[in-house]
């Protein structure tokens, strides 16, 4: 039997789903996105229940695994890590006159950290100005995006964080 559910980014629902899975004695848990994977990891610590994660941008930085080569514990999965330098090069290839790039992300999302830092490093090394705007809700993200347009950015870079993706 396969049991599945979707918390729709609601932390309370996520907790209930994980508790239900544990009460049902599932043989394996699969978590999609960093917050779910982290909570599943914590809830299965000290048990034999393995956790497989996906759509986690920085599993090492999030503390899910010790390394990508040897994850450790009873946990493994896949990463959707962004090759930020390639994305920046693509932006420049599409618009060689790019002078200013907007960074749009949720500052509270662990999945944003590595990609945003890599983007800043690339732009610093290549003399590209950047403007950061953040939002923690859909409404704030819309306002931040509008602000980037008003700031006159030539392009916008968004990492794979859950708030921006919704």
Language-model region placement:
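Short, polar/charged alpha-helical segment
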Residues: 1-2, 121
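Beta-alpha junction/loop-to-helix N-cap segments that form part of ligand/metal-binding clefts
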Residues: 6-66, 161-166
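Pocket-lining segment of extracytoplasmic ligand-binding domains
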Residues: 104, 110-166
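An alpha-beta-alpha
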Residues: 76-126
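Structural motif
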Residues: 2-23, 134-149
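Structural detector of well-ordered beta-strand residues that form the stable sheet scaffold
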Residues: 50-52, 76, 131
């Amino acid at each position: 039997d396969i049991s599945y559910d979707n918390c729709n980014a609601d932390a309370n629902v996520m907790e209930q789903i994980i508790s239900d899975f544990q009460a049902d004695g599932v043989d394996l848990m699969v978590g999609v996105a960093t917050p779910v994977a982290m909570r599943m990891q914590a809830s299965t610590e000290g048990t034999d229940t393995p956790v497989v994660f996906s759509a986690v941008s920085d599993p090492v930085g999030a503390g899910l695994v010790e390394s990508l080569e040897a994850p450790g514990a009873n946990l493994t999965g896949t990463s959707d890590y962004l090759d930020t330098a390639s994305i920046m090069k693509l932006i420049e290839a599409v618009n060689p006159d790019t002078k200013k790039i907007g960074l749009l992300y949720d500052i509270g999302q662990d999945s944003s950290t590595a990609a945003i830092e890599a983007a800043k490093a690339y732009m610093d090394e290549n003399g590209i100005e950047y403007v950061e705007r953040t939002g923690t809700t859909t409404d704030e993200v819309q306002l931040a995006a509008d602000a980037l347009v008003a700031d006159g950015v030539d392009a916008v870079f968004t990492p794979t964080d859950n708030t921006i993706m919704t």
